[in-house]
């Protein structure tokens, strides 16, 4: 399937929700996992609280969170404990419905940059992965965009590319522990 949310730790990778194409196109609520050091197909982990695609995934070493999504647009954040198979639980909500933003984390703070709902967004929102609760606004990107990529290390998070409405090549960064508006990389 495609248009999934994903998150991982050093042992497991999780693939959540998305769209399946056989026998017909439909959204799914399934969560699958792989073991990083082994090859093979994904294995059933559990289910999301809702059927959704285009979620934004962030994680720590112990917890994965899947935020927002589409069909319909959603502000819901689900979470699972990565080491324990089972269904997702409610973590909290985004400040607004959103999908297809650029997610990243430093293992403590999960950040969602940009997105779409039903217009392109420039807001940056964050959660503390270890503490359930609603996301809060963190700053803004340099340009509204949907479908960007997100990546990070322990200090800096990057939101790159996307479309607004044509493809863009802008790379923004923030210092994860400080928040605030993004700076051009």
Predicted features along the sequence, with ranges:
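Polar, enzyme-active/binding microenvironments
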Residues: 1-185
């Amino acid at each position: 399937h495609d248009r999934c949310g994903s998150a991982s730790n050093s042992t497991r990778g999780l693939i959540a929700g998305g769209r399946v194409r056989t026998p017909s196109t439909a959204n799914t609520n399934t969560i699958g996992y792989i073991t990083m050091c082994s090859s093979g197909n994904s294995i059933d982990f559990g289910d999301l609280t809702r059927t959704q695609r285009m979620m934004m995934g962030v994680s720590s070493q112990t917890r994965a969170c899947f935020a927002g999504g589409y069909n319909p647009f959603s502000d819901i954040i689900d979470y699972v404990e990565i080491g324990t198979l089972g269904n997702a639980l409610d973590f909290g909500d985004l400040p607004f419905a959103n999908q297809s933003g650029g997610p990243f984390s430093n293992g403590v703070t999960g950040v969602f940059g940009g997105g779409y709902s039903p217009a392109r967004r420039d807001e940056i929102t964050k959660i503390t992965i270890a503490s359930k609760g609603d996301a809060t606004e963190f700053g803004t990107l340099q340009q509204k965009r949907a479908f960007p990529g997100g990546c990070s290390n322990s200090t800096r998070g990057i939101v790159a590319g996307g479309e607004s409405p044509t493809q863009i090549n802008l790379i923004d960064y923030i210092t994860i522990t400080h928040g605030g508006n993004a700076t051009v990389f």
